[in-house]
Design a protein with these regions (language model features):
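Short "repeat-start/strand-capping" segments in structured domains, especially the N-termini
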Residues: 512-513, 585
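Short edge-strand/loop segments of extracellular domains
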Residues: 521-524, 592-598
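Short aromatic-acidic-glycine turn motif
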Residues: 15-16, 596-601
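A cross-taxonomic marker for long C-terminal extensions/tails that follow the last structured domain
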Residues: 633-667
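Extended amphipathic, helix-rich lipid-handling scaffolds
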Residues: 1-58, 66-291, 303-377, 386-508, ...
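C-terminal structural cap/anchor segments
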Residues: 576-579, 585-593
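Outer-membrane beta-barrel and related beta-rich outer-membrane complex signature
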Residues: 379, 599-609
Length: 703
């Protein structure tokens, strides 16, 4: 027999009476509207219709219950609406159980099995949820989560999570945010067991920054698979995954880079323990498209505070050219414009131990370079192939590290150096990089321009913090000026260049020398000393020096520079000469002829060009008389005194006669000539314009 019924009922304190429910429900009564039939013979209750209303939700459903020693449910279906998320908060793992949730969810359930050991399958859905915690906020969150629950575990399969406007902003710590985040995942949850979550994450518009704003990432697009295990009892989280970034900009101290061209991939297998704030990295590998793969393993203590690291970093396929382009050129080309003119190649390997806090990080290990190359983009010069094996010990800190024992020594071998039409044979030396100091232990010998250049005692006291500070000695031995001027595309002249500079020092933006360079040319000698270079690594270096001229044959000098023909001997000095962008900007000069008993004559062409330089006028109108019968004239004195500063050139002659400054003083014997400087003060830029005109003048201003 069967009993058909339709009734209403109220279950008092429903949540307190049903201990088997996996979720703790709010206290209150449960109101039921039931319709169905009951078979006395089978002790079976069939619910054709169920409507339920309680403080935590409303629901509709159908089902079958067999009453025996333990009531058993079969073919039961329930649809819950307007479920407040607070009912699940206490059952979430830390830190999710400490956040607040606003919004509602819907759930569809299918139940079967003994009343005290139900098997439940279903699906939970929600949209437009909001999440807020002490350090985190989510503006909008939607979730779709199929699940299975039994007495042993709660298992979610194929979870779909979409979140927008996520912000993580703890005080005085790293902060992060994202415009959009999508997660597809599955996880298992058992009471007193670690939560296991695996799936895939896709994020866009992601960004982060350090507490001091020195490290910033923006517009990041990140995606990849992951697996996360959260152990509430041990307060630990294990994360493994492979994450790729398709776009984004990164600012890390002075470095700025666009990740779009590099397609970075981060491969992780790490554990984080909250109580000890420690990250153990079994595998933390970073790959950049043009740089290579860097493998990292070890531990980071005080991870969320100023970290202290104990890591091993290594690579077998590191590209110095890719590193130079991505990390150095764009970051430092304004400070060092020379970088824009360089190209670097080769393959590097390294194995480095990193220890200490990030603001005083110690690095020790070995690096090697094969088939290295350094060249000008214009291909004017090339150094390579280069082979390097270098042990190193450095400290990334503002202050220099304390002195240690004797440094380990490595080797540097350069197979070839090409400069213009010169090729320098192989070079080998030993070197060390210890306590931030880079030292070459053997001199470098360069066979070039028919002579030799020796660079010795090359030393950077603090390569990392002050790379501009360098010291070395230099010695040149009989370089052939004919080959040198040809290589530099200067006017060709012969002679040799010899010099010894026992000390060259560069500090900040100034390079100073202590010594003298001597050039034997034009039949005489030029000695250069007090050489200084201001801003040597900029696009506009300034060179300062003093020069002494002895026994210069004017005939060789004038013919070399196509200035007509002048015979005689020139001597004098040029003090405080400053060259900027290849042009003099300051000098004090006293150059004059010296009578050594030889011929002293000057051609009409040379006279005319001197006249144009001194007056700005061609001498043709003044040329006449007997001068037309001669192509050269005798002189007794020739020269000038000049001072240049701030584009103002003050020009004085080799002899003063009243208010006249004589540039050329004629001899007692004819044919003779005098040239007067008609311009004693002139803009140096105007003098350069006159130089452009001298080839148009062929007659002197004759008195």
């Amino acid at each position: 027999s069967a009993i058909t019924f339709a009734s209403t009922a109220t279950l008092m304190d429903f949540a307190g009476g049903w201990r088997a429910m996996p979720i703790k429900l709010p206290k209150g009564d449960l109101a039921l509207n039931l319709a169905g039939h009951y078979s006395v013979a089978d002790q079976t209750l069939v619910l054709n219709s169920l409507r339920m209303s309680a403080p935590f939700a409303s629901a509709t459903g159908t089902g079958r219950v067999v009453f025996g020693a333990v009531p058993t449910i079969s073919a039961a279906k329930l649809i819950f609406r307007d479920l407040p998320l607070e009912i699940a908060q206490a059952h979430l793992p830390p830190p999710l159980n400490r956040w607040s949730y606003s919004g509602q969810a819907q759930a569809s359930l299918e139940l079967q099995g003994p009343w005290n050991a139900l098997d439940v399958t279903g699906r939970v859905e929600s949209s437009m949820l909001q999440v807020r915690g002490d350090d985190i906020a989510v503006a909008s969150l939607s979730v779709a989560a199929p699940f299975e629950w039994n007495k042993l575990a709660l298992r979610f399969k194929d979870i779909k999570v979409q979140a927008t406007k996520i912000v993580y902003s703890p005080n005085q710590r790293w902060q992060a945010a994202a415009d959009k985040l999508q997660i597809g995942a599955a996880f298992d949850y058992q009471a007193d067991q670690p939560l296991k979550l695996s799936g895939r994450i896709d994020g866009s518009g992601m960004k982060f920054k350090s507490a001091d704003d020195s490290k910033v990432g923006e517009n990041l697009s990140v995606h990849g698979p992951f697996e996360l295990i959260a152990d509430a009892a041990a307060t630990s989280v294990s994360l493994s995954g492979k994450f790729s970034a398709d776009s984004g900009e990164l600012l890390w101290g002075k470095f700025f880079g666009d990740l779009k061209t590099q397609k970075p991939v981060l491969e992780l297998n790490a554990d984080y323990t909250r109580n000890s704030d420690r990250l153990d990295c079994r595998r933390c590998n970073l790959a950049l498209a043009s740089v290579g793969i860097v493998a990292v393993g070890g531990a980071v203590d005080h991870f969320s505070e100023p970290p202290n690291v104990r890591l091993l970093a290594s690579s077998a396929n590191f590209s110095p050219g890719g590193f130079f382009e991505f990390f150095l050129r764009e970051t430092f080309n304004r400070q060092f414009p020379l970088l824009d003119k360089l190209a670097i190649a080769g393959q590097m390997a390294f194995r480095l131990q990193l220890n200490g806090p990030l603001n005083a990080l110690g690095i020790a290990g070995d690096i090697s370079l094969k088939n290295g190359e350094l060249r000008a983009k214009s291909n004017d010069w090339r150094i390579g192939p280069i082979a390097l094996d270098l042990p190193l010990q450095i400290l990334l800190a503002d202050s220099k590290p304390a002195a240690a024992g004797a440094p380990r020594v490595g080797t540097l071998a350069i197979e070839r150096i090409r400069f213009a039409n010169q090729t320098i044979p192989p070079i080998t030396t030993t070197l060390s990089l210890s306590n931030n100091a880079l030292r070459l232990h053997q001199p470098i010998h360069l066979a070039i321009f028919g002579g030799e250049i020796e660079i010795g005692s090359l030393f950077w006291p603090d390569l990392l913090n002050d790379p501009k500070q360098v010291a070395f000695s230099a010695e040149t031995k009989r370089l052939k000026l004919e080959e040198l001027t040809q290589a530099l595309n200067w006017p060709r002249f012969s002679g040799t260049l010899t010099g010894s500079i026992p000390q060259v020092q560069s500090a900040e933006n100034l390079l100073r020398t202590n010594g003298e360079i001597q050039a034997e040319l034009f039949g005489g000698r030029i000695r250069m000393g007090k050489l200084e270079i201001d801003n040597p690594f900029s696009s506009l270096p300034s060179i300062k020096l003093d020069a002494k001229l002895d026994a210069i044959q004017l005939e060789q000098l004038s013919q070399t520079f196509a200035f007509g023909r002048i015979s005689g001997i020139l001597e004098g000095s040029i003090d405080n000469l400053v060259l900027t962008d290849g042009q003099p900007s300051e000098l004090r000069a006293d150059l004059h002829s010296v009578d050594r008993g030889g011929e002293q004559r000057i051609s009409v062409e040379a006279l005319n060009k001197i006249t144009v330089l001194s007056s700005g006028e061609d001498a043709g109108a003044l040329y006449g008389g007997l001068a037309g019968f001669f192509d050269s004239f005798r002189y007794s004195k020739l020269g000038f005194k000049a001072t240049l500063k701030n584009d103002r050139l003050t020009l004085r002659g080799v002899e003063s006669r009243g208010d006249q400054e004589m540039l050329v003083v004629g001899s007692f014997l004819p044919p003779t000539v005098n040239i007067v400087s008609h311009t004693q003060n002139i803009a140096f830029s105007e003098l350069l314009r006159r130089l452009e005109r001298i080839n148009k003048s062929d007659k002197p201003n004759v008195q």
